[in-house]
Amino acid sequence: MARACPSLAWQLPWALVAGLAQAASLAWPWGGEPLWWLQLASMAMLAWLLRPGADRAVAWHRAALIGGVFATAWLASTFWWLFISMHRYGALPAPLAAAAVLVLAAFLASYYAAAMGLFCRLAPLHRAGAALLFGACWLLAELARGSLWTGFPWGAGGYAHADGPLRVLARYVGVYGIGAVAALLALLCVQWRRADLRHWPMWLLLLAGAAALALAAVQRTCAIDLCDTPPPWRRDPTLSVELLQGNIAQDEKFRPGSGVALALQWYGQALRTARAQLVVAPETALPLLPQQLMPGYLEGLARHYAQGPQAALLGIPWGDQATGYTNSVLGLSPATGAMPYRYDKHHLVPFGEFVPPFFKWFTARMQIPLGNFNRAGVGQASFAWAGQRLAPNICYEDLFGEELGARFIDPAQAPTVFVNLSNIGWFGNTIAIDQHLQISRMRALEFERPMVRATNTGATAIIDHRGQVTHQLARHTRGVLRGQVHGRGLDAHSGWAITPYAWWVARWGLWPLWALAALALAWAMRAQRMRRARGA
């Protein structure tokens, strides 16, 4: 006779602990590194709470509650630093700022609550297919969080695997696919540990065979080499870079008498004295609109880079009251002349860069400058320089791999180097810096493109195409990071021009992952109907 499920008073604290462990796995608070094994352990704990025995699964409504507690703890302890931007820099009262973080975490956790409830409603009790369904439900929740209501996928479980064995999957299925595989493996481990899988070696072989067939189909259909190593006779040119980190205090950054003057003086001098082929200054390094700058300031920089063998990318707000404002990157080089290259940010930060409908009352209580930008398009042109195609992205835009992937629709014009310009100073000296670094590393793995990062306070770094940090500047210091970066994919006809992930995400976005998850759900519902018919 099956035993009753454990009480909620016992399950919910463990769900809370598992959620906290999931958050810590993304960037360990005492070192900043991702811990893939801790993420798997936290997922295994969640799976065990949902299926406490070989012949027992919790009721769907209890599963939803467990999943909601797990996800709320995970998300709130992942982006708790939003409190700093709202309270310290936005002057929002501390209780209201803390409540806002918790409400956001609980709202996003509702996707996981629904997914876990659906899993326990549909999953078979004795089959390894339950692991497949668990991975599919987890994938649906991650996709919903990353896509709906502008999307906020910060802290997705797959980022914990930037250094783990599952990192090899990034070039095929991206961070969401890695998270789904981790969920599948977590439930398989739980079932294997208690002998719930009567024929588990056969199931694992079937899963491995299906994965191999899928990869072979991708290689044949897309004409993409699945090997990461480039041909030995092919070597892309090296680009020397200088990445500027001004470390302008966030509470001074937009004050005319202090931070603004310091930023204009320091960045102006650094941009003029740099010697590298490419110089990058971070997001809003120049914290004034062009028409607010002292006469000749921007024109002087443009003339400097028009005369020498150098180029610069620098962050600056752009526009006017008539046309609207954008958070932009300006590109200066001998080729641009009087018409500099410009990239405008597409994925704006809710409440910080635009006001969502019905929330003006909330943003009115905060004192955040530059808070109402226009949104630009996806897939903007790259900045061509020194034989490279440089693709800027601003702030947390590198969180959305599907949007970066839009630039890979034509391999001949695909980026060879990603350039991230950020200002994480809004969130203080917190784990947000390390989390953002892991996000950039995952993008480098997915597209096999190096990522250079110029930030106000950190992490200013150079990441190679294998996701390894090769150079990094000390956080919260003022300085210049010098290094070399090797662009990738200059030859559009070589087998390693783009990864499988870049190929399919450029064409269909995240829809293939949505479709795979939906197919798994359809299979589970059909299997459930068949079981009920046999029972009748």
Swiss-Prot record:
Keywords: Acyltransferase, Cell inner membrane, Cell membrane, Membrane, Transferase, Transmembrane, Transmembrane helix. PROSITE patterns: CN_HYDROLASE. One of its GO terms (molecular function) is N-acyltransferase activity. It is found in: Cell inner membrane. Signal peptide: none annotated. Its main location: membrane. One of its GO terms (biological process) is lipoprotein biosynthetic process. InterPro entries: Apolipo_AcylTrfase, C-N_Hydrolase, C-N_Hydrolase_sf, LNT_N. The active site is at E283 (proton acceptor), K345, C395 (nucleophile). GO terms for cellular component: plasma membrane. Pfam families: CN_hydrolase (PF00795), LNT_N (PF20154). Coiled coil: none annotated. Pathway: Protein modification; lipoprotein biosynthesis (N-acyl transfer). The keyword Cell membrane applies. The chain crosses the membrane at residues 34-54, 64-84, 89-109, 129-149, 172-192, 199-219, 503-523. Catalyzes the phospholipid dependent N-acylation of the N-terminal cysteine of apolipoprotein, the last step in lipoprotein maturation. Belongs to the CN hydrolase family. Apolipoprotein N-acyltransferase subfamily. This is Apolipoprotein N-acyltransferase. The gene is lnt.
